Amino acid sequence: MGMGDYLSKLLSDKYGIQTMHHEGVYDLVDGKLDRSKAYQLAEPEIQKILEDNPSIEVVIDLHRDGVAEGTHLVTEVNGKPTAQIMFFNGLSRTKANGNIDYLKNPYIEDNLAFSLQMQISAANKYPGFTRRIYLRGYRYNMHLKPKTLLIEAGAQTNTVEEMRNAMEVLADTLDNVLTK
């Protein structure tokens, strides 16, 4: 079971949060890994899912971070080794040029606020679980819905156990933010 499946199962079974897990692959072009257009390729399908399911309140784009082989993004939560996570936000702007007009995003503030709520909730209950909120110029399809989270969960250097433990903490944190 992949981590998206596991997170979806935790949210629905343990917390009663109805989920839909989309497993589209958008970074393989003609059988070769190419991430340069992944968000552009995903956008129409994600838009359709949101249009067909207007009750969706939260969108989570779950990734593993790519780090140097010697880097291990792990902390201990409740005595268990747990992969750390990082919230990633697209601002549709650059420091040098300001707003990127062709990358409109009406939900920048909503998504930043949601990331910050998640970060604070996790820091209060699970110190060390989150890394930082990472800000970049692109929008990463975060313009499609308020309460969109792009999450870098662990990295390729984390074990399955560490990742599963992280999904448990992430699910609990999401439940805390959404219901409290």
Task: Locate each region found by the language model.
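N-terminal catalytic or cofactor-binding beta/alpha core of small enzyme domains
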Residues: 1-57, 65-75, 168, 178-179
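Soluble non-cytosolic domains of exported or imported proteins
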Residues: 1-2, 33-40, 105-113, 157-165
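Loop/turn elements at helix/coil->beta-strand transitions in domains of secreted/extracellular proteins
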Residues: 15-18, 54-58, 82-84, 128-129, ...
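Structural recognition of the beta-strand scaffold that forms the well-ordered cores
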Residues: 19-21, 58-61, 86-88, 132, ...
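Solvent-exposed loop/turn segments at secondary-structure junctions
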Residues: 25-29, 64-69, 91-95, 138-141, ...
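A short, glycine/acidic-enriched catalytic loop
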Residues: 68-104
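Active-site-adjacent substrate-binding region
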Residues: 107-134
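Active-site-adjacent mobile loop/cap segments within catalytic or ligand-binding domains
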Residues: 129-180
